[in-house]
Amino acid sequence: MGENASFWESLIYAHPTCVTWKQEAEGSIYHLASILFVVGFMGGSGFSGLLYVFSLLGLGFLCSSVWAWLDVCAADIFSWNFILFAICFVQFIYVTYQVRSVSFDKEFQELYSALFQPLGISLTVYRKIVLCCDAEVITLEKEHCYAMQGKTPIDKLSLLVSGRIRVTVDGEFLHYIFPLQFLDSPEWDSLRPTEEGIFQVTLTAETDCRYVAWRRKKLYLLFAKHRFISRLFSILIGSDIAEKLYALNDRVHVGKGFRYDIRLPNFYHTSLPETPPVPPPRRLQRRSSGRPRPGVPNCSSPRKQ
């Protein structure tokens, strides 16, 4: 203990104390560096915040280097400040390169602005999601099928970007799928990662549609690597299923003017006027809400672009 005490005493008290203080202030370069440090440490998060912090801190260290070289004439102070300036400069270049490299096609940029950006998802996280679907938007032509009842396997998760999808079971209309809604969220949620299944409904394009598709196995690998993305998709899929249940609730009738409420366990029904299905407000573009055209849909495979 005595040796430790003597060490700390020598470290703290061995240096000579300042008897007289300088009356004159340091040069303007020193004060400019201090101001840049204060303002620089007020930066926020994200790419913009990093660029802000590294640029101002780099300028502050550069001013400190100039001050140490011209006024103090201390090689060690100059060396350390110049090294810190070089580190900030390299970090600024690296962040700038990352910002320039994170760019998407128009449809993916619109999808980010409409769905992911309001949730606070950064561009780096969104880039991982886009790369998982190979940055590809698939085209589904009018009256072509995305899935057929009892035939199409459940091997992917798709999100509608534009157009409108009609969902039917045994030829009976259930509900529509609009932009920014998943095409197969109930099927995805009904299966475990190791299970396989087939669609119990038919999904047909009412208009020319564009959608993004993530392969099941590839998406689960992404979830395993990034738990945040897994929680994000869990929230999005749960919200999407809830919207589909509300849309399906409008299709359950007792008689004229009466409807069941499938959200309640006893199927409590209320008297409401019949209204056509209305798309949710969260979508990329507005489409007409006409009824499905008669005829047998052409269920050829969609085109990739």
From Swiss-Prot:
Instruction: Give a single Pfam family match.
Output: POPDC1-3
Q: State the residue spans of region: Disordered.
A: 273-305
Tell me, what does this protein do in biology? May play a role in the maintenance of heart function mediated, at least in part, through cAMP-binding. May play a role in the regulation of KCNK2-mediated current amplitude.
Which InterPro entries would you find in this protein's record?
Answer: cNMP-bd_dom_sf, POPDC1-3, POPDC1-3_dom
Entry protein name? Popeye domain-containing protein 3
Record has Transferase as a keyword: no
Provide the membrane topology annotation: Multi-pass membrane protein
GO BP annotation list: regulation of membrane potential
